Structures are given as C-alpha cells and as structure tokens.
Amino acid sequence: MAIHPSKGTGGSKQSNSGARFRQRKISVKQPLTIYKQSDLPTLNASNDLEPSQIHHLNSNANQQQRDIHAIETGVDKNEEDEVHLQQVINAAQKVLLGSQNEDGDKKKDDSDKKTDASVYIPTPDASRIWTDASKYYNDKSFREPETYIKFSATVEDTVGVEFNMDEIDEEFLKNKLWKNYPKVKSPKVKSEKLDDTNKENDNARKCSEVEFEIICDKLEKIIEEKQPFLSMDPSNILSFKELSAYIIEEFNNSNKDKPYVQLGSNLKYISTTALKEKLSKELSFEPFVTLFDKSLLDQTSTNIVRPIPKLLELFGEPVYEHWKYRKIERKGKQIHPALKFEDPSANEKDNDNDPYICFRRREFRQARKTRRADTLGAERIRLLQKSMHRARDLVMSVCRRELIKLENWETDHAIFKLRSDAKNLKRVVGVKGDDFLFYPHKRKKIIKVKEEDEDKESSKIKRDKRSRFDSSREGSATSMPGSATIGTNAINKDRLANGQVHHTQEASSSSQPYVKLPPSKIPDMGLVTVSLVLKEKNETIKRAVLEKLRKRKEQDKDFINVTDDPYQPFFNIATNTKFKNNELKHIPYSSIAATSFHEINTTNYISEKLKNLLEEGKKPLPGTKTFRGSNGELIPSKPFPHLSALIQDRIDNSQFNSVSYIAQLLSNIENNNFSAYNNGYGQQQQHQHQETNRDKTKLSDPIFRLRKRVGRFNRNFVDRRGLMKRPNDVIDDFLKFDDEGVNDDCDQMDVDSESISKNNVPNVYDSRVDEIKRLDSRWQFDNDLTEYDKGLQSPFSLDPSRLNCISDDTQSIRFGSMLLSKSYDLLRDSVHQRQQALVQQARMRTLQQQQRNNKQQAAGQSSGSSSASLGSNTNSNSSISGQADQGQTNLTNSGITRQGGANVNGSQTSTTNNTRSSVSGGSMNPKLPTQSSQRSNTNSPLLASQPQGYSQQQKFNKIPPTSQSQSQSPTHAAGQLQTSKMYNKHGSNITPSNLKGPKFTPANNNQIGGSLPNRK
C-alpha cells in the first residue's frame, strides 16, 4: 500500500497548510485508499526507497504540504528518535537529495557511498541453522501431530505451570532432593513385572522437574492468596502444615455437581495440569491424557505427574524449606518477577503514568454508556452461555458413555479369560456338562412399539375409503341425463363442506383436549364417583400399611423391645422450671413464650408385665432362647438381673411418670374443672415438682428486693418485693362467709329488721364482709409475687396488650380511639345516606310543585283580575320585599308560602312555592327571579344541615287551598312573617349579605305582582 506524494513544490501556502495538518490515528472503522503500482509516479532505477518514504523525506526536507492520506514511517512518534532508525532516515535523505540535484553530485567520494550503503536496522538473522540444537533439545519422544488444531484452548490454558526453575532450583533438585528423597525403599522386583501404576513404584520414583515446579507454584499461589502483605514482614510466613492443609482442602473440594462455577482461587490455576485434575475428577477417570501429551508407551517419559497430595507427602517439607529460604531472601515478593499489565479497575491516568506496565493499548478506551442495546447484548450472551453449557454437557455425557463402554469391554475381556481358563481346567480334570456357561448368551432385542406407523396406516385407509366414496358419487351423478352440472356442483359443495369440517375438527383437536364422540361410539362404562375413588385409595393405603406391619411383626418375632428409643415414644409436657425470670402472661398469644413455658420430655413406655419381669429378675423373658455353648442346643434364656438395674431410672423416676399437660387437660374437661384457665396450670404442676425441686439449691434467686424512691413533698418510699407472699389458702378460708356471719353483721347495725327484710341492702361502711373484701382487694394491686410466680398463677392472661408490653392507660386510649373512629365512620355513612334520601324527596316535591304552579297559572290567566284589594296587597308586598333577603318568607294567613334558600356556592337556588289559586283576586307573575332560578341542588348544605326545619316547612306547605278573607290587614300579615336561620356545613350562621344569587329588594316591588302599582 502506498500513497501519492504531494505535487506542490515549496511556498508559503504549503507551509501554512502543513502547520494546520493534524495527525490522526488509524481507525478500523474508516476505509483506507489502496493504490496500485501503476497509479504511482515512476522512480529512478538507482532509488531503492518506497514512495511513502520518499514523500516523507521530501516533506521533511522542503517542508512541503502534506497529503491527507500521507503515511508515516510506520513507527510511533516517541520511537522515531531511535539511533539506528535515524541513521537509516538520514542516509536515505542524503541519497534522495543527491538524486534530486540533477542526478546527484558525481564528485561524491566512494567512501561516503559505502558508509551510506552499510547503514541498516539490525534484525536477527534467521537464515542460519543452529548446530547445537540437538544438544539442548533432545526430546525424541515428541511426535508431531497430524493437525495443529486440537481444541480451542487459549494460551493460558496450555502454558503449563507458571513457576520456572532456575540454576539455584536445579542445584537443589540434583544435590539434595534426588539424593535424599523419597525416603522409601524401592521394591526389588523384576523388570518384566514393573508397572507404573503400582503404588510402591510411585512412592519410589524421584521428583521430576515438572513436579517440583508444580509444588512451588502451588505454594506461591496459596501464599499470595492467604498472605497478600507478606512483604511487610517476611519472617511471619505460614508453616508447612498450614499451607499443605490449604492445598489439600482446595484439591478435595472440587465441585463436581456444578462444573461451571469456579470460586475463590480456582480461577488462578488456569493451566493444563489444573484442567486435567478437574476433568479427571469430574469423569472419575485417571490418568487424563490429551493429544498434546507424550506417549504413555514411553517409559522414560516424565509426563505422568503424581497428584499434589502425594507430592506434598513425599517431597513437601524439603521443597517448602527451599522455597521459604528464597521467599525470605526476596523479602516476601515473588521469586520470579512477573510482567505488569494494565489494571482495568484502576484509573487510566495511573496506568499511563506507571512506567512498568508492558503491552499498552494503542486504541482509546471507550466510555461505557447504559443503553438499550446492552440488555439485548446481555441476553444474547446468556443464550450463548447456555448453549455452551449444553455443548459441554453433551461432550461430558459422551465421555462418560465411552468410559462405560470401555469398562464393559474390559469386563467382557476378563470374563472371556476366566472362561477360557475354566474350560482348560475342566478339560484337564475331565468334567463334562454345563457347557452353556462358557459362551455368551444372546441379548434380547427391545421391540419398540411403532405407534406412528399404525396411525399412518389407519389414516391411509380412511383416505382410501373417502376417495372411493367420492368417486362413486361422481359416477352416479354423471350417469343421470341432464344433471351433470348439478351433480358436479353438488360434489364440489360437498367437498368444500367436508374440507371445512375437516379443518374445523383439526383446529378444535389442536385447541381442545377433549373429543366429542357420537353416542354410538361411547363405551358402556359405569359412572365412577369421587367417593368411590377415595375409598379405593384409602383401602390401598390401609392394605399397604397392614402389609408393612405384618412384615415388621415377622421380623420382630421372638424379640422384646427394651431399647431406649422405641417406635412410639411417650411425650410428657411439663412446666419449664429453668426459665424463671421470663414473662409468662402472654403465653396464649405468643408461640415463643409458649416454648419457654412448656418442657417436653420424651420417654419410652414399658408395660406392666415387662416391668414386673424386670423387677423380679428370676423368670426368663418370654419367647427368648439362647444357644448352649457345649452342644449348641437351643434352651430358654436365663434372667437378666442387670437389665432391671439399667432401666431402673426409667421405672422409678417420677419426673417421667408425672401427669402430663394433655392428660391433665383431658381430665379437667371430663370433670368440668376449668379453674386451670384462671388459676394457671402451674399450680397443678407445682405440687408434683415440689419433691423433685426440694433438693435443688437456688443460688441465683434473691431473698427479697427493696427499692427506694422519692414521692411528693420529698417523702421517701421503700417498695418491697419478694418479702412476703399472699397466703392463698388462709385467706380463701377466711373469706368463706356463712349466712349466720352475715346476719350477725347485720344485727350489729342500727337498722330495723323490717327495713332489712324489705331492702336487704346492708350499709357498705358498717358491713364486715365488705371491709374484709376491701382489705383483700389491696393484695390484688400490691403483690409481692415475681413475674414467674404471676405467670404460674395466671398464665393465660385476659389482657392481650401484655403481649406488646403496652400499659393499661395507653391501651384504654387506643381502644377508645378505635371505637370513636369506628363510630364516626358509621355516623358519617348514615348521615350521607340520610342526606341523599332528603335530596331525593326534595326533588320529587319540587317537580310536583312545578306541575301544580303551571296548572294554577293557567287557571289564573283565564280569570279576570279585580282591583278592589290592591291597596291592602301593596302593604303586604312591601313587607315581603323588606324581609325577603333573609332567605325564607312564610305568609300563612294570606295563603301564600314562599320559601327561598340561597346556596353557599352562589350558583343554584332551591325554592319551594305553594301558592293559592288566587291572591286577593290577583294572579302571580311567572317571571319572579326566585321562580326563574328554581332548581334542585343535590349538594345543597342547606338541605343537609336543616332536615328538621325543612320537614316543618313542608307541613306548612301542605295547607289545603281554602278561601281567605281579602280584607286582611297588612300589619297582621307582616306579623306572621317568620324568618328561618341558615347555616353552612360548618355550623356557623350565614348572614343575608354573604348569600349569592337573586334577592328581593324594595326596588323591584313592581315585579312581585303583575297588577301591583308602584308605591310613591
């Protein structure tokens, strides 16, 4: 690949453009132009340089303009200052300049030409053959493989052991290790019987160089993992026992079930030996050999490496001492320094500034961005990993199958050898018969049921029948004259219908699991019920259990179970006496407290008959016999006096024979004794455990407790706890009052007997019984019992709040707030329902009232209006207009009832008018502002807050239309006006000035009645 040189020659423009040129690194994404030789300019025959080099020299010499596609010398900028490279460039530049000055200066000396021609970049000469190669590489056992590609392993997988021996290690191996180790005498056997797989021969074999490197490599890896900061104090290195224990543990803990998972330090051992060990363990096959290994037929080969536990056992200690000496000498660092690479987790500047990093990257590190394509890429990587796992599983299963086949062939070969030897021995002895044992029998072939073929045959038969039927129908249709077209059309329709039915049947069979059969093909079977199926299932289970019990009984025949753990152990639940300071009042509400309260003892159950036999120790056990030592006769067994001594603690121990919790509970239920729920189960068990706990010393329990506290007015109080206990029995006997004692107390009072017989209520302050009860009530609130004793008396507390350690005051507040919130919710729901019902009733009434008003207005327009009583009506109208701003106006005497309510929102008005047919001979104007805005608001707070007032107004509205006197005085009508109060939803009064909507003002008095004149 070459690039055209620049065509320009010198100039200011060229220098300016050259200064603006910016070099870019070669990118893989951008294409590069490739020129052929014919595209390049012709060169002189004496010039041996490439066009790109000539262009580079021209640009450097004359500072000409660089071409965009100009290529450098192929060397980095920081490496262009290398000595040999500069010499070659300078020599080439001299040659180029000499050829440009009219074919060079012919006066140049021959010596300069020779020196320029001798300048070159030194490279190793690979054309020669090394004669001493056979001296150092004398490995004749290596065989060149047919193909070099054997498996897709990386370089790290085939690199082998990372530790390499040097001269010091080689001297130690030859002078010390080979002479003194292994310390096992080699077996004196013939060379013909020498076998490499023999354990004794493995122990006698010397340590090879590869094995020495493996041991040192393991020590290096383990010490790097366990002591990463060993360079701080090299003398504090781990001992050989600790390191060998870590190495052997890692060797034994290979995960066979999950071969893809490599945890911990297993990732560091990527080598051929590690792969062989892992695969040999997974396949349980040794030795694991690859195609790159040497031939196993070569006895001198050192390829067979013993496992690391064996190497540590034979050569571990001396190799460890040698390695430790070199490790301390290196001050805790690696014995052989390794190359330093870029740290991907470190900062890019740190990697760039570190001078010891080799093999730096030339491309830029791209910044990671979270994009949507990352999820797709991750999913594809997961699928690829799954497919690789499947491929690996397939390969491993194939390997296991081949190993099983190999084992089968080896066993067949061994059987054949044994048969041949037995046949020869049979011939020598002269035994005849049993010849069928000396030849392999033919194995029966497994006949597979070919269901698919049968299905195919049945489908073919059905198709043939269908085709015959169609052909017969076609023949019958064509034989009839004049019906050929009709027959063909019918056949085509039938075919289409059959095809559609066939397709629908196929679709239904693919979607539904059930097939609908015609009644003729349904088999005659009885209906199987669920109860019958369950009954058969239970019977089979019972039969299986009985069969197992029968077999077990036959096995245990003539045996008596006197073991410590029989088949059906006996459970005894008692109160736990170990935990005395625990809170036991919330046992029914907490499983944790119940586990600490009850103590379960498992014992064995010994029948009374067996107990008597063991206690007597005279009679032999029934059904047990022994063999006599003299003649082997079977005689009845002698008694076992020592057996009763062994089980004596089980028989006499009252702790195991005490009444259990379940037995006590059942007896209480039978006797209707439910005092244990109030008094506690501990009182019943307390008497049983008194004898057992009498001898036990209670060192941890204090005698009593005192507490000093300061009360009001700086008074000191001393509270005692545990000083005295309530005498329950004495107080209970003392509190048992007879009728005579009560009567005696009553006689002492200054009350007549007649009043006593009438009232039968004694005076509280004079009654002796009440005084004693009040005295006893003090013990209930001032008790010296401990929490454990309280728990024994009343373990089943009636207060569930004690489970969460909540005080009584807090619990009462919580309970009251809960009831209040619940009642508030119920009240709110009921009020809401009541409001909806009232609003619905108001809607119905307004609709009815509108209908009545329309009828009355139609009747009023037809009748004439009289002007006799206009003067009296004007006074009443003025009074109405003066008080209409308050929201409601009722005129009961004049027969007019007008109720107007303004909404708080100011948008709607609910008004109910119940008018008479005639008002003083006049008619009502239908264009009143209250009537024009006559609507029903469902969210009206006026209706919600005044349901009672509304019902009262409705009572007044239901006045029947009767004739009233037209000469009623205006003062009397004004005196009958009643203004109702209005409230908002918060209960506060609403002033008429705050109401929005239409109002009655004195200015529009002329609009109240159609025939009312203005009053001046």
UniProtKB/Swiss-Prot annotation:
GO terms for biological process: DNA repair; regulation of transcription by RNA polymerase II. This is Enhancer of polycomb-like protein 1. Component of the NuA4 histone acetyltransferase complex which is involved in transcriptional activation of selected genes principally by acetylation of nucleosomal histone H4 and H2A. The NuA4 complex is also involved in DNA repair. Involved in gene silencing by neighboring heterochromatin, blockage of the silencing spreading along the chromosome, and required for cell cycle progression through G2/M. InterPro entries: Enhancer_polycomb (IPR024943), Enhancer_polycomb-like_N (IPR019542). Residues 842-883, 904-923, 960-971 have a biased composition (Low complexity). Component of the NuA4 histone acetyltransferase complex. Belongs to the enhancer of polycomb family. It is found in: Nucleus. It holds the Pfam family EPL1. One of its GO terms (cellular component) is NuA4 histone acetyltransferase complex. It comes from the Eukaryota. PANTHER family: ENHANCER OF POLYCOMB (PTHR14898). It comes from Debaryomyces hansenii (strain ATCC 36239 / CBS 767 / BCRC 21394 / JCM 1990 / NBRC 0083 / IGC 2968) (Yeast). Keywords: Cell cycle, DNA damage, DNA repair, Nucleus, Transcription, Transcription regulation. The keyword Transcription applies. Residues 1-50, 96-119, 450-488, 499-518, 842-1016 are annotated as: Disordered. Residues 103-116, 457-473 have a biased composition (Basic and acidic residues). Residues 35-50, 475-488, 884-902, 928-956, 976-994 have a biased composition (Polar residues). The gene is EPL1.
